[in-house]
Amino acid sequence: MRVNVKKLIGKIAENDFTRKAFAEAIGMTEPTLRRKLRGESEFTLGESAKVREVLNLTTAEYLEIMLGANLN
């Protein structure tokens, strides 16, 4: 998945999560989240769905952030 890291980090902050708290909320460790945000590993489909759920993303936000889709 081609994640828009900048937008994802923005949504994490907008929802008042620290990276550690967000990682725990989606069921991973902070180092694992860090690797995914750096592009060293990819989010699985299940992890991506959990991100959407925890951040309460709309379909458009999900597509833009987690799939790198430009809907404009």
Language-model regions, residue ranges each:
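Short alpha-helical DNA-recognition segment
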Residues: D16-R35
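Short, basic-rich loop-to-helix N-cap that marks the start of a DNA-contacting helix
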Residues: E40-R52
